[in-house]
């Protein structure tokens, strides 16, 4: 199977590409830089798979990358500026949004120029569980109403851009992803750092619901979506064991043998982070109904199980 991964040089893209290549698939990373997304040994020989980088500008449907679409079976679109990098000034928020919309629009335009009988059959497009905004104690399935925060509006517009591939004959999966837990995962490293430094604890009230997913399961869901036509539309990429933030901090502390009694008041976080504080203070009790109904089985469904695998692994 030949798979294109725009934005595949980030954390999830690297893990996903390695998994696909090791199982014999051909992976083409679309990257804006000239440097390889992986050191050569990571590409591996697998069972006949391969890994290539192809340059694109992530804005226009032109260049050699467009030719790669013909004969590919799927596209996994991860392209977009890092949400967690840099303070959210107006300029930065505009960049976060425009980078996603421009890249996705370019992909859809390129699909349209590809002969219908040579087009990929599926587009798996990243999105965020923040789509739903701050929802308190409501249990949220994929049919939940969208929120009105910056991240919610961004996710809505991103998904709308991706859905334009449906009239072109592609099955579109919108992967509403929660915080990815994994060894070396940037957001997870930031989450656990205060606990490691003995200053972990509740963020704001700590009662906001905290959704998460182990890196092996976000990879598993993307691969499941590639291969299973039963999965389409919005998918909540969240582990079944949903906790309040204060409970997550406590579990991290138990695994790391650290106290978690040091609170970070909401007012302080808003003063320090501005709009970006919504990443820490807003919560949603989202459940993975659609993925589980389609037959996906989580490898790391429990919070303690996931934390021990990541934090105690040598």
What is each residue range found by the language model?
Residues 156, 180-190, 225-235:
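Glycine/proline-rich active-site loop of Rossmann-fold NAD(P)-dependent oxidoreductases
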Residues 52-103:
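NAD(P)H-binding glycine-rich loop region in Rossmannoid oxidoreductase-like domains
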Residues 190-217, 221-224:
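A conserved pocket-lining segment of Rossmann-fold NAD(P)-dependent short-chain dehydrogenase/reductase
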Residues 93, 105-149:
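Conserved Rossmann-fold NAD(P)-dependent oxidoreductase catalytic core, especially the SDR/UDP-sugar
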Residues 127-128, 160-183:
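Conserved beta-loop-beta element that borders a ligand/cofactor-binding pocket
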Residues 225-275, 308-314:
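Mid/C-terminal beta-alpha module of Rossmann-like enzyme folds, strongest
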Residues 278-314:
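C-terminal amphipathic/interface module of NAD(P)-dependent oxidoreductases
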Residues 3-23:
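N-terminal Rossmann NAD(P)H-binding glycine-rich loop of SDR-like oxidoreductase domains
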């Amino acid at each position: 199977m030949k798979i294109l991964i725009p934005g595949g040089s980030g954390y999830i893209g690297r893990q996903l590409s390695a998994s696909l290549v090791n199982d014999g698939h051909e992976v083409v990373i679309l990257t804006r830089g000239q440097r390889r997304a992986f050191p050569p040994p990571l590409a591996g020989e697998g069972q006949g798979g391969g890994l290539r980088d192809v340059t694109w500008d992530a804005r226009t449907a032109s260049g050699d990358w467009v030719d790669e679409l013909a004969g590919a079976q799927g596209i996994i679109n991860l392209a977009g500026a890092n949400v967690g990098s840099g303070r959210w000034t107006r300029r930065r928020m505009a960049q976060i949004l425009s980078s996603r919309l421009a890249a996705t629009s370019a992909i859809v335009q390129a699909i349209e120029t590809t002969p219908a009988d040579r087009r990929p059959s599926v587009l798996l497009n990243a999105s965020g569980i923040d789509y739903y905004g701050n929802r308190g104690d409501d249990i949220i399935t994929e049919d939940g109403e969208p929120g009105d925060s910056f991240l919610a509006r961004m996710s809505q517009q991103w998904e709308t851009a991706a859905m334009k591939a449906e009239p072109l004959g592609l099955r579109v999966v919108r992967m509403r992803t929660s915080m990815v837990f994994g060894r070396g995962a940037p957001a997870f490293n930031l989450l656990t750092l205060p606990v490691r430094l003995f200053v972990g604890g509740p963020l704001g009230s700590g009662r906001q619901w905290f959704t998460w997913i182990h890196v092996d399961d976000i990879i598993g869901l993307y691969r499941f979506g590639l291969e299973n036509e039963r999965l389409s539309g919005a998918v909540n990429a969240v582990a079944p064991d949903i906790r309040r933030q204060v409970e997550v901090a406590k579990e991290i502390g138990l695994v790391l043998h650290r106290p978690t009694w040091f609170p970070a008041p909401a007012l302080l976080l808003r003063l320090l982070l501005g709009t970006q504080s919504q990443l820490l203070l807003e919560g949603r009790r989202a459940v993975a109904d659609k993925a589980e109904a389609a037959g996906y089985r989580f490898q790391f469904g429990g919070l303690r199980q996931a934390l021990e695998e990541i934090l105690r692994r040598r």
